[in-house]
Amino acid sequence: RRDIDWMFANERRCETFEEVIEEARAMRATGAGITGGDPLMAKERTLEGISRLKSEFGPGFHLHMYTSIPFNPELAREFADAGLDEIRFHLLGLDAERYRSTISACSESGILTGVEIPCEPDRREELLSLLEELRSFDISFMNLNELEITVGNHENMELRGFNLSTEITAGASGSNELALDMKSRVNAAEQSLPD
């Protein structure tokens, strides 16, 4: 949740990890995503939460975390030792180089490491350049999210000239097409085909 220092499990506000575990049991969860704000802003609590969930549910309980902070690479081992399975980096300003050493450390620590970005149609060339740059990074995946127009961002989206792609989705026009284009470039590269 943005700008508040509270823990939630689904939509339930939790004061303790016991409440988080109770919620996970109630929904028969097989894993959990750790989001924010940014979980690194409460690093010790995040590490404790990872450790507690793994201890309670076992090694098969998949834990992934989202962050936009290029944290000290030495922390990667702490997250791996606590039980973090996967980390997804949101690259602020699309400045991948700031994240290189952290990404490498996470991968080397055995954490499945990837990048997750919104496909902003007005940043097409920057995103295609980023895609090329990331070829030299030690990542296992890249998630491309459709840019959504929401109550919280609609004024900014309007200023940037975005419209809804259809009446049945909150996706910005052109975002899905950009994601598919980027995906086809990655697939072509994997097969050593021109993109």
Tell me what each language-model feature is.
Residues R1-C14:
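Canonical Radical SAM [4Fe-4S] cluster-binding loop centered on the CxxxCxxC motif
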Residues R13-C14, K43, I69, A96, ...:
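A conditional alpha-helix N-cap/helix-loop micro-motif detector
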Residues E15-D38:
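Short Fe-S-cluster ligation motifs
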Residues A26-M27, G58-G60, E190-L193:
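Short helix-terminating capping/connector loops at secondary-structure junctions
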Residues T30-G33, T46-S136, S140-N143:
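Radical SAM/AdoMet-radical enzyme domain recognition
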Residues G37, L92, L147:
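Flexible loop residues that form catalytic
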Residues L40-M41, D95-A96, D122, T150-V151:
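Short secondary-structure capping/turn micro-motifs that flank functional sites
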Residues S101-D195:
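Conserved C-terminal portion of the radical SAM core fold
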